[in-house]
Amino acid sequence: MPSLDVVSTVDMQAMDNAVNNAKRDLGNRYDFKNSKYELELNRKDKAIEIVAEDEFKLKAVIETLIQQCVRFKLDSKCLDIADSHTVSLGAAKTEIKIKDGLTKETASKITKFIKSTKLKLDSAIQGEQIRITGKQIDDLQEIMRLLSEQDFDVPLQYVNMKR
């Protein structure tokens, strides 16, 4: 029986490259000359910490980071941007969590959606992935298209498609 796995993973090397390119771009920008900002990727916690002189510069750093993520083919849905707060001397700080893997809630939403499509498919949650099996490969391709059209707040990838 044909099957495929639905996962949500983030390439941390590509994320590291996006953060480094964002730092380089910000260093070349005229409005960031002689201003202090920090943009650090914590691979262990899968988080990005941003500190900037003010709220405007913080938003500019976030926008530059998102542009670089798109450039490296990372979906911006994988970034969970927290609200910013003020630290010493008016500086603004925020932390961006990187969503890696499917949560149980998201996985159950996806399986409910698959069941609601009335396609002849079976889905099973296996840790941080969902295994979808069906009798026809066309049904699997159709569910891939339908899942891509939906918004589950995480980027979805389809792996291990077996005929």
Swiss-Prot record:
Coiled coil: none annotated. GO terms for molecular function: nucleotide binding. This is Nucleotide-binding protein DehaBAV1_1126. Transmembrane segments: none annotated. The keyword Hydrolase does not apply. Nucleotide-binding protein. PANTHER family: UPF0234 PROTEIN YAJQ.
